[in-house]
Regions:
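His/Asp/Glu-enriched, well-ordered alpha-helical/loop segment
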Residues: 197, 201-218, 222-227, 274, ...
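Active-site metal-binding motif and surrounding structural segment of the metallo-beta-lactamase
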Residues: 36-52
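Acidic, glycine-enriched loop/beta-strand segments at the rims
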Residues: 12-22, 359-391, 405, 424
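N-terminal metal-binding scaffold of metallo-dependent hydrolase/deaminase domains
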Residues: 1-40
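A glycine-rich helix N-cap at a beta->alpha junction
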Residues: 110-126
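Short, surface-exposed loop/helix-turn segments at secondary-structure junctions
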Residues: 275, 318-319, 387-403
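Metal-associated gating/positioning segment near the N- to mid-region
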Residues: 50-115
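Histidine/acidic residue-rich metal-binding segments in metalloenzymes
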Residues: 132-146, 151-302
Length: 442
């Protein structure tokens, strides 16, 4: 007997075709895809002609465990993920204590094995003192460098330290590209003489376009100098797209997040600190240039940078208000809504959110709906239109910057390793994800 049979689905192919088919899953893999399958299975999902996608891989989340589990933890964050059709996530190291050695990585892996309902992988955080660990810990999806200070205590901004990290080892380096010196200069210029808390939109002026562009340029030059595999996280400006369009070696990839595609500085007026993040949301016009970067291939993939804080924390006056917002459970509906508005194609969504992240991080057998691949899937209702509601958010933060926005295309079922984990609004008990492995040799 097989584990799972999905009947009468529109099965999404990498080229955007959606032929009707049944999908048979067993032992965590897609066993067979055919127009009609007659087989006994422990569970049958009647897809009703809805669209079946490969599970989304979110390559940048902050699930806050250990150290800030009042905001999120691996259990709540992964529940939010599967609600949004995300079946695998890569989690960042800026927790407390930070993930900077094998002991901390092992702790996270053990915790995720007991609580995460999606598949999981973890970055190791770079400091100026842990060069040996950066290249020896296993398994890690990459090295995270904060070139500009953000949530947590990880910061590497001195050129000599960056040179040592890029020059030693072969593991992928993922950079938060904001220039710390310029942040400090802009902070002094714009905040030091104020007697009243400034408006939240000053955040986008402090961490301005040049703050991002300087750091992106530094990282790119280091990658070229040492031939090092580089991934630039959350591009936010049109200037970065222009820069990379003209000078992006084969070993360099980059991403954008929905916040920078669907929000801009006008949103501060209504949402205030809820849209404060690093790098910040930008002036109108940048989103169009980021979209162009996606379409032309300068930008490779989409992540969320899911970075939750409580509303009590977010409502503090600037600059005490922390940067970051939830996003893991709305990214796919946002992109499916964009698809239906003609901003992208299904093939592009699949490349940006499924197969692309698997390729960037060397994750085998994920990201495509093919026989022999892992049975990580999401069944979506492309006709379902409803607003994002804070009271329905699974993240422990309990809110979304997109609350009230009408989105079309919501997951009905999410399947991890051939087992249904999210079922029409609820997470089933007893299903856990598995640790991801990473191969950068191919």
């Amino acid at each position: 007997m097989f584990d799972l049979l999905i009947r009468n689905a529109q099965v999404a192919q990498a080229d955007g075709r959606t032929p009707p088919a049944d999908v048979l899953c067993h032992a965590g893999r897609i066993e067979r895809i055919a127009p009609s399958i007659d087989a006994e299975a422990r569970e049958t999902v009647e897809a009703g002609g809805h669209l079946l996608l490969p599970g989304v891989i979110d390559p940048q989340v902050h699930f806050r465990e250990p150290g800030a589990t009042h905001k999120e933890d691996l259990a709540s964050g992964s529940r939010a993920a599967v609600r949004g059709g995300v079946t695998s996530f890569l989690e960042m190291p800026n927790c407390r204590p930070p993930t900077t050695n094998q002991e901390q990585l092992d702790w996270k892996l053990a915790q995720a094995a007991q609580t995460a309902v999606a598949n999981y992988g973890f970055f190791i955080g770079a400091t100026k003192d842990n060069l040996d660990a950066l290249n020896s810990v296993q398994p890690a999806c990459g090295i995270k460098i904060f070139m500009g200070a953000s949530t947590g205590d990880l910061l590497v901004d001195q050129q000599s330290d960056l040179e040592r990290i890029f020059a030693n080892g072969e593991r992928l380096i993922a950079v938060h590209a904001e220039d710390e010196a310029r942040i400090n200069e802009r902070t002094a210029a714009l905040l030091n003489d104020l007697t009243q808390p400034p408006p939240y939109e000053i955040h986008s002026q402090i961490r301005d376009t040049q703050t991002a562009l300087i750091a992106t340029g530094r990282a790119l030059e280091l990658s070229k100098k040492y031939g090092r595999r580089l991934h630039i996280l959350h591009l936010s400006t049109g200037e970065e797209v222009d820069y990379l369009r003209n000078d992006k070696p084969a070993q360099v990839t980059c991403e954008v997040i929905p916040n920078h595609l669907f929000l801009n500085t006008h949103d501060y007026a209504q949402l205030g600190s809820r849209v404060q993040m690093n790098p910040p949301i930008r002036e109108p016009g940048n989103a169009e240039r980021l979209w162009a970067g996606l379409h032309e291939g300068t930008i490779d993939i989409i992540a969320t940078d899911h970075a939750p804080h409580t509303l009590e924390e977010k409502d503090q006056p600037y600059p005490k208000s922390p940067a970051g917002m939830p996003g893991v459970e709305t990214s796919l509906p946002l992109m499916l809504t964009a698809l239906q508005k003609g901003q992208c194609t299904l093939a592009q969504v699949l490349a940006w959110m499924c197969s692309g992240p698997a390729e960037v991080y060397g994750i085998a057998n994920k990201g495509q709906l093919m026989e022999g691949y892992d049975a990580d899937l999401t069944l979506v209702d492309m006709t379902a239109t409803r607003p994002v509601r804070n009271e329905e958010i699974f993240s422990r933060a309990g809110w979304s910057p997109f609350a009230g926005r009408q989105l079309t295309g919501w997951p009905l079922y999410t399947i991890v390793g051939g087992r249904v984990v999210f079922d029409n609004g609820a997470v089933r008990p007893g299903v856990l994800g598995k640790a991801l492995s990473f191969d950068f040799t191919t």
